[in-house]
Amino acid sequence: MGRSVKKGPFTDTHLEAKLMVLNAASEKKVVRTWSRRSTILPEFVGHTIAVHNGKKFIPVYVTENMVGHKLGEFSPTRTFKGHSVKAATEKSSKPS
């Protein structure tokens, strides 16, 4: 279930406050945050937010298409190394 429309979108207050200060001064600094749970608001468009993925900060440039999504969606936490090639070598090594 999604969040109630009555409540409105959730964003951490410290993140929203930092971006409002940057908007008022019309600055474009990179803002570092651990708040992957925050919803992207229209006021965030045009800013670069460095989102923590558990190991390092991934810079995310916010565009209009991202509004309504969570910051964590754009900072992957897992790296896919690929499946093992063991099954492929077993098939090719069988004598015919």
From Swiss-Prot:
Disulfide linkage: none
Keywords: Ribonucleoprotein, Ribosomal protein, RNA-binding, rRNA-binding
Superkingdom to which the source organism belongs: Bacteria
Gene3D superfamilies per the UniProt record, alphabetical: 30s Ribosomal Protein S19, Chain A (3.30.860.10)
InterPro entries hit by this protein: Ribosomal_uS19, Ribosomal_uS19_bac-type, Ribosomal_uS19_CS, Ribosomal_uS19_SF
Pfam families: Ribosomal_S19
Role description: Protein S19 forms a complex with S13 that binds strongly to the 16S ribosomal RNA.
Family: Belongs to the universal ribosomal protein uS19 family.
Name of the protein: Small ribosomal subunit protein uS19
